[in-house]
């Protein structure tokens, strides 16, 4: 099955990512699995990828704002989420330090690291992100300070906070993010696919 997946490469993985996935399939981890592994299992069952499931969820929320200017932070190399939303008619700009414009089908592209202390969100109405890792706290702080609507699915493992400390586990990290939001955001749990439950941090107002 992995050979068929590698040939189809539905999630546009690099050769290294495909090689790492094959190794993980042959030698599964006992505690955690990679996002690529989850998408592989979804594919073998004929189910949508995580990006497609999150895009479907977000698009229903964004339908209330058909002309909104949307920024996806942490879109990755191929900006799959942004492209799916653009195909649905939304006005999307994609941002990531590794985004490759040859994959983005002409979408506005910003190749940069997102930093809440320097990034001006005035050109955008809504910010979205899917598991943006170290950018998570930056997105939260930027949207709070600049009063922007946002939807962000969270990684299932903790990431360093801006001051450099590392939370002990995902729950401690989520609690920290809610404390930083100071009432601006709330955390919800969603079943976007049959395999996992996804934590989504969102602004309380707007959507």
Language model features by range: what are they?
Residues 119-124:
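A short acidic, Gly/Pro-enriched loop at the edge of an enzyme's catalytic core
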Residues 139-149:
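A short glycine-rich, Lys/Arg-flanked "PGG" loop and its adjoining helix->strand segment in the class I
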Residues 125-140, 156:
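A short SAM/SAH-binding and catalytic strip from SAM-dependent methyltransferases
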Residues 148-161:
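Conserved beta-strand signature within the Rossmann-like core of class I S-adenosyl-L-methionine
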Residues 68:
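Nucleotide donor/acceptor-binding cores
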Residues 71-117:
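SAM cofactor-binding core of SAM-dependent methyltransferases
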Residues 166-207:
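Active-site capping/gating segments
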Residues 1-65, 80-83:
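S-adenosyl-L-methionine
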